[in-house]
Amino acid sequence: MIDLEVIHRVQATLVERKGAAPDSSYVASLYAKGTDAICKKVAEEAAETIMAAKDGDRLHLVREVCDLWFHSLVLMSHFDIGVDDIMCEFRRREGISGIDEKKSRPA
C-alpha cells in the first residue's frame, strides 16, 4: 500500500512555495514561469518515463515516474487541486470499467 502521507507532505511544501520568491527554489521558479512552463515540464517527464519503460530498467523507470508524479503535483498545486481531489476521483472510478467510464464523460 502506498504511503500517501509522503505525498501529502510534498504537496504541503509545494503549496508553501507558491508564494515564494522565484529565486528561492526550483518549484517557486516554475510557478513564476506559469502554466505553460509547468505543462512543458510535465510533458518532458512523461516522455522520459516512456523512454525509461522502453529501456526496461526498473530503477530508472521508478525514478522517472517519481519525477512525473512530482511535476504533476506541481501542476495540480498550480491549479489548487489537491491529492485528496485525485483520490476522490479514483474512488469514483473504482469498479467501473474503463469503457463505461469513458462513455459517462461529457462529449
Predicted regions and their residues:
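Flexible "arm" and connector segments at domain edges
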Residues: 1-65, 69-107
